[in-house]
Amino acid sequence: MVKIFALPANEGDFIWVAYGENEVYSHILIDGGTDECGEEFASIISIIDERKEKIEALVLTHVDYDHIQGALEGICRISNDILDRTVKRIYFNTYQGIHRNLKGTGEILESSVCIEDQIRVNQNYKEYGVKDGIKFGELLSEKGLKDRLVDCVVYGQQAVLPNGATMRFISPGEKELIKFANEWEKYERENEYVQYASNLEMVKKNLADLMQEKLLSDSSPNNASPIAFIFEYHSIKLAFLGDAKPSVCLQGIKKINDADHFEVDLLKLSHHGSRSNTSDSLLKTIRTNNYLLSTNGHHKKVPSKVVLSHLLKNAGKKDINLYCNYDWYNTEYHERYFTIEDRRAFIDTKKLSLYLLDDQALEIKDGCYIYGEYGMF
């Protein structure tokens, strides 16, 4: 059995995967949302520890605030003993890891400023007494987690987990990591790219018409570097794309799959449904009719309606299921995201079904369930 919890994380990602049999689970945590999610992140670690189970992989996909900050705030709240018992591996690409592992494959500029040193825990917890925050590396050292860190992840690698589960990485590539190490950009929460914020005019158009609109390409070095992977357990396959670029994921898929396409049971849309992080080629290659969207709508910036139109365009005769952890289509757009024609052609006919996740299980396939809250677990 696999349980997926796509937890509300404001504009970010915060995903918990539990897999196992007979109510005994292994766990994967993927990102931790914004800093407001820190308490819940800590609570989940405590729940797993109380069950005497393990976090096989804590994946921090990349440096952006809306993915990493809640995880770091949560780690701060948990005792070293619990973390030592519970967390087995942390996957996060750092400058030091990139430099150490890839310096022979491309020109990596020497820098006195490491990316990871710019990531700080903002809150002033008593056990540290640090006013300006504690650096990422220092946090791992003080929490006894430094030796659990896998700090250079590239596509083609694989993590073998207990009970026959695997994580096969499809992003980033070596070239992208080297570029990221040399050109990384500090994430500004309120300063997004123009194409990321161009959704308002598009929602006035019909989905059928938007199928002719082109998808864009994300130029951010930060979003060339996120960790993306395929999780497999028995017959269940899940694709978690973080904020990864589709062109990089396509290269990664070629590293793990010889066929021209790859079937999965669920795909977490990259970058919260941004127009710049999905492509027709990706949708044709990683095939599914079940999509997960993690966003609160982020001030009407995501998801791009063009992306939804292309999900439908590439679906063929299949109906599309879109699982959401916020009802952004109502709250952000006052129920005007979909036009009358959209509702007639796609919503009413169930060609596009939207599901708002809560603590009740929705079955994706036999043995695989998705939630938006974890309740009593």
Role assignments for model-derived ranges:
Residues 1-51, 221-247:
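Conserved beta-strand hairpin/beta-sheet module of binuclear metal-dependent hydrolase folds
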Residues 2, 10-13, 254-261, 285, ...:
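C-terminal regulatory/interaction regions
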Residues 5-7, 28, 59, 91, ...:
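Hydrophobic/aromatic beta-strand patches that form the interior of the parallel beta-sheet core
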Residues 11-13, 35-36, 63-68, 97, ...:
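Active-site environment of divalent metal-dependent phosphoester hydrolases
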Residues 16-17, 67-73, 101-103, 250-253, ...:
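A short acidic (Asp/Glu
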Residues 25-26, 39-91, 258-276, 285-292:
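Active-site metal-binding motif and surrounding structural segment of the metallo-beta-lactamase
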Residues 27, 239-309, 313:
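Extended hydrophobic/aromatic segments used for targeting, binding, or gating
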Residues 78-237, 320-325, 337-377:
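Flexible, acidic/histidine-containing loops and adjacent segments that form or flank the divalent-metal
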